[in-house]
Amino acid sequence: MNEIDEKNQAPVQQECLKEMIQNGHARRMGSVEDLYVALNRQNLYRNFCTYGELSDYCTRDQLTLALREICLKNPTLLHIVLPTRWPNHENYYRSSEYYSRPHPVHDYISVLQELKLSGVVLNEQPEYSAVMKQILEEFKNSKGSYTAKIFKLTTTLTIPYFGPTGPSWRLICLPEEHTEKWKKFIFVSNHCMSDGRSSIHFFHDLRDELNNIKTPPKKLDYIFKYEEDYQLLRKLPEPIEKVIDFRPPYLFIPKSLLSGFIYNHLRFSSKGVCMRMDDVEKTDDVVTEIINISPTEFQAIKANIKSNIQGKCTITPFLHVCWFVSLHKWGKFFKPLNFEWLTDIFIPADCRSQLPDDDEMRQMYRYGANVGFIDFTPWISEFDMNDNKENFWPLIEHYHEVISEALRNKKHLHGLGFNIQGFVQKYVNIDKVMCDRAIGKRRGGTLLSNVGLFNQLEEPDAKYSICDLAFGQFQGSWHQAFSLGVCSTNVKGMNIVVASTKNVVGSQESLEELCSIYKALLLGP
């Protein structure tokens, strides 16, 4: 479908889609973007979320104005997907008709025609009222703290990727003594044109825009209205594959096929099974925990790494090795049968570092699904430190070199790059392949998402600053048994948000036991 088919587009967009295309506010999805939308089309993934705490409260009018300024500068935050076969798209995307052929021409995306604060703030949306009641009740019972139970409740939220009244993300406002003023929020995204780093950028932009408001703002009925604001709105950025070369080397395919064959036959699998998100709630239960490492403890960890490893070493390999060693110590996960010798670690990696050195272009891609990944399959036995404690620091140094080399060689681009190659898009139905690779497969390894350390500088004249950040996600249909979301600040330290399922760990109490072992090892390896 190369021509605009207005008959099949969402009705909310029919009148102005052509105008939006001409203005740079609508276009075909890129192939990288389509991969993340496919997870939603097939109900294989729900959301990631980031908790952010500011130093002071903002009013409803301040929040509306701040969001308006952020969205005008970053139109990606206003986008929705225009599905084929509206409004029967959900059934169509999971039909034999859709699966029967490839779809190299992707659906359109466009900005919303209008957006009110009620279209963003999840508290005010009746379809989420039952979950919101539980979230606010838990927040009150925890005396204003972000807890593992709140995170677990957010994993049940489905954010529509097709609008029509809201974007592909939402904001939960957590009230304390003031019901109409907030300083604690949760950014929830379905991963369409958004990633963990996008959510961190959101809170930094929110802080900056609130600081830019010097006088009480007037009441705004809309965050954005296309017919009035289109001239103020920046153009949507081009698909990221047009500015970054994702193409893998020629040997990538045979190497991947060989390593995949070996891994599939030798990997350890748990009792947990991947399934569509609706089925998870029927047959399994998500379990969650949050580990906080205080700023003092965090500095001690960094000092410990520095004293034991020559040269520069990031914290990610330390987190990775400590996690697998903890699984060994725990003794309730790695129980391999014959020939189950391998596990895997899947580490998302930001692609923005590969953008051209141009400030304007880098600003354009602050928001988006601009993340690749590196993954490798270590031997389970190498993390057994009962009789080999002297191998602990050399193992961390080894994986630091492995990760660093992968990033230097741009391997984090290659997995996505293979899936967006022209011949793959032309001959393969990506949605069907995703389902075939996931549904019914047993969970095994770990997803480790470290979105980074974000130091907050003291600015005497600034009313608003960031006090805390915590990133987490349930891995959905990805085959990993565990998800670890890591985010750090110099104010509240490092937060590690852990998710798994009862079929993997047994119970919530078992996960808490595992996380206690992990925290103890992080603090005193």
Swiss-Prot record:
Single GO BP term: acetate ester metabolic process involved in fermentation
Membrane-related topology note: Peripheral membrane protein
Functional pH dependence: Optimum pH is 8.
Thermal activity characteristics from the UniProt entry: Optimum temperature is 25 degrees Celsius.
Keyword Membrane: yes
Keywords noted in UniProt: Acyltransferase, Endoplasmic reticulum, Hydrolase, Lipid droplet, Membrane, Transferase
Induction: Expression is repressed both by aeration and by unsaturated fatty acids. Also repressed by heat and ethanol stress. Rapid induction by glucose depends on the cAMP/PKA signaling pathway. Long-term expression requires both carbon and nitrogen sources. The activation of transcription is dependent on RAP1, and the ROX1-TUP1p-SSN6 hypoxic repressor complex is responsible for repression by oxygen. The putative ROX1-binding sequence in the ATF1 promoter is 5'-CCTATTGTTTT-3' and the RAP1-binding sequence is 5'-AACCCAACAAA-3'.
Chief location bin: other
Keyword NADP among UniProt keywords: no
Stretch list, region Membrane association: 24-41, 508-525
Reaction(s) catalysed (UniProt annotation): an aliphatic alcohol + acetyl-CoA = an acetyl ester + CoA; a fatty acyl-CoA + H2O = a fatty acid + CoA + H(+); 3-methylbutanol + acetyl-CoA = 3-methylbutyl acetate + CoA
Annotated active site: 191 (charge relay system), 195 (charge relay system)
Localization per record: Lipid droplet; Endoplasmic reticulum membrane
EC number in record: 2.3.1.84, 3.1.2.20
GO molecular function annotations of the record: alcohol O-acetyltransferase activity; fatty acyl-CoA hydrolase activity; N-acetyltransferase activity
Disruption phenotype: Reduces levels of isoamyl acetate production during fermentation to about 16% of those produced by the wild-type strain and causes a 40% reduction of ethyl acetate formation.
Regulation: Found to be inhibited by cadmium, copper, zinc and mercurium divalent cations and sulfhydryl reagents. Inhibited by the addition of unsaturated fatty acids to the culture.
Domain notes: Segments of the N- and C-terminal domains (residues 24-41 and 508-525, respectively) are predicted to be amphipathic helices and are essential for endoplasmic reticulum and lipid dropplet association.
Annotated family: Belongs to the ATF1 alcohol acetyltransferase family.
Annotated function: Major alcohol O-acetyltransferase that uses acetyl-CoA to synthesize acetate esters from various alcohols, producing ethyl acetate, isoamyl acetate, isobutyl acetate, butyl acetate, hexyl acetate, heptyl acetate and octyl acetate. The alcohol acyltransferase activity is promiscuous with regard to alcohol but relatively specific for acetyl-CoA since ATF1 does not use any other acyl-CoAs (C3, C4, C5, C6, C8, C10, C12). Acts also as an efficient thioesterase in vitro with specificity towards medium-chain-length acyl-CoAs.
Note: Present with 1990 molecules/cell in log phase SD medium.
Protein name as annotated: Alcohol O-acetyltransferase 1
Organism name: Saccharomyces cerevisiae (strain ATCC 204508 / S288c) (Baker's yeast)
